[in-house]
Amino acid sequence: MKLVESNDTVDFPDGVTFTVKNRVVHVTGPRGTLKRDFRHLHMEMERVGKNQLRVRKWFGVRKEIAAIRTVCSHIQNMIKGVTKGFRYKMRSVYAHFPINVTLQDGGRTVEIRNFLGEKIVRPVPLRMCHCHVVHFTRTLD
């Protein structure tokens, strides 16, 4: 069954600005600017008032209506990223082949050695410009 109209709104806090043009959302806050492209989803996005964004779908089926809340959640995560930021803690865990992880180029590249017993070295470039990587040497059990 198709509903005539389904919508949801996202409230933006003070200090966070946003622009929407052709389903491309730009969010700017104290920690930087994020951009997300939602052109693959066929729905309307419009500014309502100064600090609200409405996501609307006309005559949507169940999957399209579920995508409305998904878009709003992505935008809320963008707001969280430009206000508070994110921190990721990662550990290398192995069962048989001991993995060796080293930092190269001043923390811009991570080299993974002996991954699944491979002889090659896997360099992983970190594309984030505001990324801070710390190598924790103490073993945790």
Swiss-Prot record:
UniProt keyword annotation of Ribonucleoprotein present: yes
InterPro entries listed in its UniProt record: Ribosomal_uL6-like (IPR000702), Ribosomal_uL6-like_a/b-dom_sf (IPR036789), Ribosomal_uL6_a/b-dom (IPR020040)
Any Gene Ontology CC annotation: cytosolic large ribosomal subunit
Signal peptide location: none
Pfam family, one: Ribosomal_L6
Gene Ontology BP term (one): cytoplasmic translation
Record keywords: Ribonucleoprotein, Ribosomal protein
GO function terms (MF aspect): rRNA binding; structural constituent of ribosome
Family under the similarity heading: Belongs to the universal ribosomal protein uL6 family.
UniProt name for this protein: Large ribosomal subunit protein uL6
Organism, as annotated: Haemonchus contortus
